[in-house]
């Protein structure tokens, strides 16, 4: 049905956007290396922690998309996305604190901020994918459509 096709179009768009953000983050890593910029040990750990959270979200979203998980799984995805949002705000504050204490360069700070913002957007798109699948499936149930 048209609603299901529309949902799948949105899923494809969100997958493409995840790829765009991944490419942007990779470009930032190259730029960091070219500029000779390094992150503090704390910043590196924070990035690794946030990356792990986002990777878990992507994996769970894929499992939901493949329908390896039931609809109740969405609560877990919403909770994870809220934790990623909170983590981004927390890391932005840590970044500002390091800049204020001159523990990092403005270049490192800018790249750090851009990377964590990109990761947060990836988490948003991962949640969108599951949300569109849920709505598509619920529309199919309501209309009796076959997928």
What are these regions (language model features)?
Residues 1-147:
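Cytosolic, long alpha-helical scaffolding segments
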